[in-house]
Amino acid sequence: MLWCPSVLVPLIAVAACLPVLAIGTPLEWEFAITLKSKILFVDEFWRTLASAAHEFDELSALTFDETEELIYFNDQQHRNGSIFSLRRDALMASHIAEQAIQRTGNESVGGLAYDPLNRNLFWSDTLQKKIFFASIDSKVTETPKVLVDLSQEGARPDGVAVDVCRRKLYWTNSNITHPTVESIDLAGTNRQVIIDTDIDMPRGIVVDQLSDRIFWIDDLKGVFFALKSARLDGSDRQLVLHDKHHEPLNLAVTNDAIYWTDKTTKAVWSHPKVPIVKATTTTSPVKAEEEDATETIPDIEPEPVAEVSALLRVANLSEEARGIVARTGFYQRLQKDEHCANIVRKVKERLDLMTKKKQMRSLVDEKTAQLERDHCLNGGTYIADRVLCICPTGFKGSRCEIRECHNFCVHGTCEISDRAYPKCYCQPGFSGERCEISKCSGLCLNGGHCKLEDISEKPSCECPHNFAGERCEQNSTEICALFCRLLKHEADIYVPFGCHDICEELAKDASDKIAIPQYHHLEVCMTPSPWTSNVIIVLVLGIVSCFFLVAVIVHGFRRLYKPKRPRIRKTFVVRKQARTNSSGDTPLTNRPLATEQCEITIENCCNMNICETPCFDPKLVEQTLAKSSNCKEDKKILIHNMDDDLY
């Protein structure tokens, strides 16, 4: 990579000529890394875009102001200045470095943080054991103020981080006798120790506004180190990574990963923000093709793999890696966040006010202003004095020309989430962050066809001939060949019945190695049985039909020849008068006797309730018997005579 010689200007302003890159705009870089003698800018694929600050000798910490596209960094050996600002010019393809904080003595900056609302810089001094802050709007010669003095406590402040939304400062105390993680309001009040147990030597720390958590590096005893996280109040502590043979210094977080610099390997490493129980350092190095070369990630379609190492070496560097920052999209991602929306609005108002103060333009400037307003696409806000666009939700790029959902979901529908990140809703049969993983991918072997269930979407395989199993992984030809080879040596071995044809085919080419199994009654087994299911069904239906027909015939005969209701048979016995009434008989002492006494014997009188023998008029009975009457008329006559002729 070719660089033009740098030119020194007053206030240590430096303009380094860079070759004009096709992607050389300020918003193209995603990570900035401080090496010993320069700052390296890389894109999201860790390809080197540019470098800057070559005139410095001992760089360490750095921080990034996304509102004004400024990087603040520290030089440990500069005579006059301690902290500097770096601005990249997109049009000139150059950078300008200016002194921001004057050196006050033999100081050593451990961590650096920036508050975009009040435009204050915060840094820790590991030698003086204090945390300082200063406004970048103040004079360079103005003495910084002390926010926290830890010199009397024996503490050693190391990493610092600003919670812009909740107006707090977090720092790590790396004193091995009593290490802590503490917080304080940016106004200097309400100091709290949020973590003081199960910690050895905390180093770099960062606040993740997207997840409302803090992440820090813990340099453990021996050769071990750990990445840990907790909520902003210190609760819900999690171990993200525990590994060895690293000397990490500073870290940065993005939406889904953590990145840190390692002095031992001179590299940048990454790991997912999700806690992993166990991880092993990857041994696949990234080859450096030239100075400060980084790994180029090929632009290929990701494929599902069985297992991927969580720890990744993303960049090999030619010098010792120290500080690192990442572009988080703070003003785009947190416009709707309940804690950050007010801060984002105030920062935008301040930027608009700064822009309005400088809008004293001529007619030529008005034409230029129109071009500037058209510079930001899709409703982006143009910051004139910084030559950058603040994009609305769902867009990115130097001119907000890139729609984040464009080609993001491979097999699904893309929507912008509440966090302003693209989110995919996958089609049936696909999964993954971008719906790039097919449930059928690599499932069916040996030419099997994969299909999905309609409801459960569970994949299954339709196997070709001579293959079986859930994934068509079982080759029946190979299995049968094994049985038939064993049969050649052991005649009594059992061979599955389906292997007969396969072994017979294989024996044509290798008859000396393959034996054909002989089955008893093979012809009978091969001949299809006549008692198939269709025959059985027809036979059963015939038998049932016969039984039904017999039942109908029997019922018809019973209805036809059903016996009639039994008739009531009557027997009449007529006798002469046995005795005459005596003078003492009265109707109350003896029943009156007719001239002739009658007696009736009734059989089969199931429908009558006659408790005593009634008397009948013999003449009436004779008339009745002479007539052809039915049972009902007989009953009426009997009952009538009982009621009328009892006495």
Curated annotation (Swiss-Prot):
Q: Which residues are glycosylated?
A: 80, 106, 175, 316, 475
- Recorded GO terms, molecular function? Wnt receptor activity; Wnt-protein binding
Swiss-Prot/TrEMBL LDL-receptor class B repeat ranges:
119-166, 167-211, 212-257
The gene from which this protein is expressed is cue
Family, as annotated: Belongs to the cueball family.
InterPro entries, per database record: 6-blade_b-propeller_TolB-like, Cueball_EGF_LRP_Nidogen, EGF-like_dom, LDLR_classB_rpt
**Compartments it resides in:** Cell membrane
Keywords attached to this Swiss-Prot or TrEMBL record, sorted alphabetically, are: Cell membrane, Differentiation, Disulfide bond, EGF-like domain, Glycoprotein, Membrane, Oogenesis, Repeat, Signal, Spermatogenesis, Transmembrane, Transmembrane helix
Report how it sits in the membrane: Single-pass type I membrane protein
Q: What biological process terms from GO does the record include?
A: canonical Wnt signaling pathway; oogenesis; positive regulation of circadian sleep/wake cycle, sleep; spermatogenesis; triglyceride homeostasis
**Domain EGF-like intervals:** 365-401, 436-473
Entry-linked SMART domains? EGF, LY
Q: Which residues lie on this side of the membrane: Cytoplasmic?
A: 556-647
Using the chain's own numbering, where are the disulfide bonds? 376-389, 391-400, 440-450, 444-461, 463-472
Domain of life, per the record?
Eukaryota
Q: Any ranges marked Extracellular in the topology annotation, and which?
A: 23-534
- Where would one find the signal peptide in this protein? 1-22
Q: Membrane-crossing residues?
A: 535-555
Under which name does UniProt file this protein? Protein cueball
| Membrane in keyword set | yes
Q: Which Pfam families match?
A: Ldl_recept_b
Pull one GO CC term from this UniProt entry: plasma membrane
Q: What does this protein do?
A: Has a role in spermatogenesis and oogenesis.
